[in-house]
Amino acid sequence: PVLPATGTPNVVVVLLDDTGFAHLSCYGGLVDTPNYDRLAERGLRYTNFHTTALCSPTRACLLTGRNHHAVGMRAVSNFDTGFPNMRGRIARSAGTMAEMLSDEGFATWAVGKWHLAPMREASAVGPFGDWPLQRGFDRYYGFMQGETDQFHPELYEDNRLIDPPRT
């Protein structure tokens, strides 16, 4: 198998819904965010990423590096109009960051909210074609739809429904 060159840095991408520059102290915000500050001190900070008002299209842009309309995610993944720009999934013709990193030997892991598979395909029985493991990630831990119960979340590890951890 292909392995990254010795000394190749880790790649950590963080996407937070409903968050702006004013929310993070590393960008001058008033909220103290020491862990994000440490990540920002040791890596790159981007200041010009186009986000949409919706989570699925923003995720599609970030993972593909392309406009959300061009990859089939005009709105949240709950909707499939049949038109190419709004299929509720990232088009197969659009490679993801995880697929490209995997091709270069990187191990990839997605954590948290996915919301990039049509709602009818985001259950324990699949189909799994648009789930993280089928879009280039080696591992996944999180919830598939746009929201989950905060006290009794519907959590998945890889492609398998799991019981939430006890708190």
Feature names for model-found ranges:
Residues 1-167:
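Formylglycine-dependent sulfatase
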